[in-house]
């Protein structure tokens, strides 16, 4: 609405208008003020429309002049000027000759891998060290100990199986009893 006037400023203006004009005549004044602002906006829109129409007519006049000049053959288009410059064969030939010379000189490589020259690195000579393997120890007598260990393993699961059979019955909590709900119908009559 009004970008420079804030909300508090509008309240101050409304309070002053209420005091000066009075509560009886304030609605009539605001209605007339709204009609006046509407008329001003209408005039501004009409002026803008007429200005735009004149601009369109001037552009159309320029286009009409260009069309008439083309019909008469007096129109020099920018394309004709560009064609005249491109018609200079010596300049075009010179550009192509420069391009061919740079390609043939070897300064430009077709493949980027050919253009890259990696610096040559000297590889250090490999050093050979002879390492002796440690001697193996003879295997200890584990064969006699293994059957005894297996016997213990076999006996242990049997003992644990007996213990687990007795543990199968896990004590459980007794089922929880639910309290009876109070009836919604009242037995009391008044």
Curated annotation (Swiss-Prot):
Stretches that traverse the bilayer: 2-22
Annotated keywords: Cell inner membrane, Cell membrane, Membrane, Protein transport, Translocation, Transmembrane, Transmembrane helix, Transport
Keyword Cell membrane found: yes
Annotated Pfam families: TatA_B_E (PF02416)
Coiled-coil regions listed in the entry: none
GO terms of biological process kind: protein transport by the Tat complex
Record keyword Transcription regulation present: no
Region (Disordered): 130-190
Domain of life, source organism: Bacteria
Any one GO cellular component localisation term in the record: TAT protein transport complex
Family stated for the protein in its record: Belongs to the TatB family.
UniProt function note: Part of the twin-arginine translocation (Tat) system that transports large folded proteins containing a characteristic twin-arginine motif in their signal peptide across membranes. Together with TatC, TatB is part of a receptor directly interacting with Tat signal peptides. TatB may form an oligomeric binding site that transiently accommodates folded Tat precursor proteins before their translocation.
HAMAP family, per the entry: TatB
Record protein name field: Sec-independent protein translocase protein TatB
Species per Swiss-Prot/TrEMBL record: Caulobacter sp. (strain K31)
Top-level taxonomy: Bacteria, Pseudomonadati, Pseudomonadota, Alphaproteobacteria, Caulobacterales
């Amino acid at each position: 609405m009004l970008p420079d006037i804030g909300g508090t400023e509008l309240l101050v203006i409304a309070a002053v208008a209420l005091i000066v004009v009075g509560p009886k005549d304030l609605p009539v004044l605001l209605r007339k003020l709204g009609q006046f602002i509407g008329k001003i906006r209408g005039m501004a829109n009409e002026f803008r429309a007429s200005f735009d129409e004149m601009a369109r007519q001037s552009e159309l006049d320029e286009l009409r002049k260009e069309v008439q000049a083309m019909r008469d053959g007096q129109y020099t288009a920018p394309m004709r000027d560009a064609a005249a410059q491109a018609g200079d064969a010596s300049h075009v030939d010179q550009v192509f000759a420069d391009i061919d010379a740079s390609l043939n000189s070897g300064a430009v490589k077709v493949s980027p891998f050919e253009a890259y020259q990696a610096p040559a690195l000297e590889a250090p000579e490999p050093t050979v060290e002879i390492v002796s393997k440690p001697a193996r120890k003879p295997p200890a007598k584990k064969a006699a100990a293994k059957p005894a260990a297996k016997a213990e393993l076999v006996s242990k699961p049997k003992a644990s199986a007996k213990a687990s059979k007795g543990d199968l019955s896990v004590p459980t909590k007794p089922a929880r009893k639910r309290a009876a709900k109070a009836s919604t119908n009242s037995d009391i009559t008044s």
